[in-house]
Regions:
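Glutamate identity and glutamate-enriched acidic tracts
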Residues: 31, 37, 52, 60, ...
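Generic signature of intrinsically disordered, low-complexity segments enriched in small/polar residues
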Residues: 26, 59, 136, 156-158, ...
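Short acidic, S/G/P-rich loop/turn micro-motifs used as interaction or catalytic elements
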Residues: 16-18, 55-57, 90, 158-163
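P-loop NTPase motor domains
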Residues: 1-74, 78, 138-144
Length: 176
């Protein structure tokens, strides 16, 4: 990939089998990390958004991808690699990855998960409140804000699923 092209490259792996998904993710992470280490240049920044982070950097067990993600979490920012990980529960992700996250966003938590040390950045009252969050409500923590911030994403004014769409007349019909 030409990383200097200043483009967004989305690699959709959802149709691949589990082994193939791990292979593709591992190959991309290795390539990005090796390129950044070789050049020593922070710019251009490389942003990696990885869903189901617990699958690639699990708390328990070892894997080459896990070690690469731990390395990126520990040294990535200084190399210009930004890792954005998404997962259902932070307690299932490698501790080194969670501890090195500078920005944390959490949605609704169940009672057992809320008491885990991974959520120690939240005030006890916020942890209790997070158990009752409705869909779209989140807590944001980042170093520039002195206390965690609770916010709600607005409901989108358009259909997000095909079954929600309403078949209307074409508003532009008859215009030339």
């Amino acid at each position: 990939m030409d990383r200097l092209a200043k483009t967004i490259c989305v690699v959709d792996i959802h149709k691949l089998q589990d082994f193939a998904q791990r292979f593709v993710v591992g190959a991309i992470l290795d390539e990005v990390f090796a390129d950044k280490e070789a050049t020593g240049q922070r710019q251009p920044l490389q942003v990696i958004l990885l869903d189901e982070l617990n699958k690639y950097a699990p708390r328990e067990g070892q894997s080459p991808i896990r070690e690469t993600l731990v390395d990126i979490a520990q040294r990535g920012r200084s190399l210009g690699i930004i890792l954005i990980g998404a997962q259902q529960t932070a307690s299932r992700v490698a501790q080194e990855v969670v501890e090195n996250a500078s920005i944390r966003v959490t949605g609704r938590l169940d009672a057992a998960e809320a008491e885990r040390s991974e959520y120690g950045w939240m005030l006890p009252s916020t942890r209790a409140r997070a158990r009752l969050f409705k869909p779209g409500t989140m807590v944001l923590f980042q170093p520039g804000i002195p206390a965690p911030l609770v916010f709600t994403f607005p409901f989108p004014p358009w259909a997000t699923r095909k079954e929600e769409a309403v078949e209307d007349d074409d508003p532009f019909e008859g215009l030339s």
